């Protein structure tokens, strides 16, 4: 996870980008100082240099999930899928549970008008 210093610089860069301002070191420092965050002195310069030639808008729009999609015909990692369980037995159990639930709906414990 990112440190507080890194997050402060990232948020400062995003604020500056949102205001359509370039992201130089002095403006990152000004925002961090205004927020009252203590940051090691190398972080603002590091982020300013890293973001100097980067289109931050496209960077934000192209954030991915972190990995390539699986191949189209690939089998699941656990091997072939097991056959589905017998559906009629499950339906009977569900119906029995529904009946119990419906019976308990009649008496909700509100004896105000009895």
Curated annotation (Swiss-Prot):
GO terms for cellular component: cytosolic large ribosomal subunit. It comes from the Eukaryota. Ubiquitinated at Lys-92 and Lys-93 by RNF14 and RNF25 in response to ribosome collisions (ribosome stalling). The modification N-acetylalanine is found at residue 2. Residues 67-87 have a biased composition (Pro residues). The keyword Ribonucleoprotein applies. One of its GO terms (molecular function) is protein kinase activator activity. This is Large ribosomal subunit protein P1. The lineage of its organism: Eukaryota, Metazoa, Chordata, Craniata, Vertebrata.
